[in-house]
Amino acid sequence: MSEREVKQIHEDQEAANAPAGLAQENAQVEETANENGSEDVSSAKKRDPEEDVTKADEPDKKKKKKRRTYDDDDDKEEKDGEEVKGKEAAKEKDSEGKEKVDADDDDEDEEDEEAEVVLGEDDEDDDDDDDEDDDEEYDESRADVGEEDDEEEDELNEIDQSNIISSGRRTRGKQIDFNEAAEKLDRENGLLEEDGEEEN
């Protein structure tokens, strides 16, 4: 027996055991499969429609997690703000007594704002004077610091210049006195030259 024959026998047994409505659907699927000549439809026959319904109801365990978008949070905040504004408007419209109290509060707020504006203008003039004083103090302090910096820089330059190695060779941490080394080389060269002159 081939695999197709085994599948066909299995399908026939399922069709016989299934209720009458399902048997008719399976028969229609078989007819369309024979007309189309595709084997994929046979796999569709094996599925039980009741299983499809239960699978749709169950959430997939391997479902990907949705990435969090912060735009959603912004939308929620905007909605909350709109709700608060709506509630405030509703409170104002609830009773005329409350509206009158709110109007008095508005007048007081306007007076406070005007007083702040008047005070703010005077403060700005004082701030300008303070800024000028601060600038002068800063300039004076920088002048004092500048004199001290020059003295410190001179000491550092002397130290740095004493440690400079003019040749391109590494000393691996050894301190080399180039004057002494030059004298030794001159003596060696001088001795060699003197020996060379005597031979001639």
Swiss-Prot record:
**Subcellular location(s) of the protein:** Nucleus
**Keywords for this protein:** Chaperone, Nucleus
Listed SMART domains: CHZ (SM01082)
Gene Ontology, cellular component aspect: nucleus
Q: State the source organism's domain of life.
A: Eukaryota
Point to the regions of Basic and acidic residues compositional bias: 1-13, 42-61, 78-101, 174-190
Renumbered to this chain, the Acidic residues biased-composition regions fall at: 102-139, 146-158, 191-200
| Amino acid composition bias (Polar residues), ranges on this chain | 25-41, 159-168
Which one Pfam family would you cite for this protein? Answer: CHZ
Q: Which residues form a coiled coil?
A: none
The UniProt annotation puts the region (Disordered) at: 1-200
Do the record's keywords include Chaperone? yes
Q: Which InterPro entries match?
A: Histone_chaperone_domain_CHZ
According to the record's subunit comment, the protein's assembly and interactions are: Forms a heterotrimer with H2A.Z-H2B, stabilizing the association of the histone dimer. Also, with a lower affinity, forms a heterotrimer with H2A-H2B.
According to its UniProt entry, what is the function of this protein? Forms a chaperone-bound H2A.Z-H2B complex that acts as a source for SWR1 complex-dependent H2A to H2A.Z histone replacement in chromatin.
The entry's family comment says: Belongs to the CHZ1 family.
Q: This protein is called what? A: Histone H2A.Z-specific chaperone CHZ1
Q: Which organism is it from?
A: Lodderomyces elongisporus (strain ATCC 11503 / CBS 2605 / JCM 1781 / NBRC 1676 / NRRL YB-4239)
Classification from the root reads: Eukaryota, Fungi, Dikarya, Ascomycota, Saccharomycotina
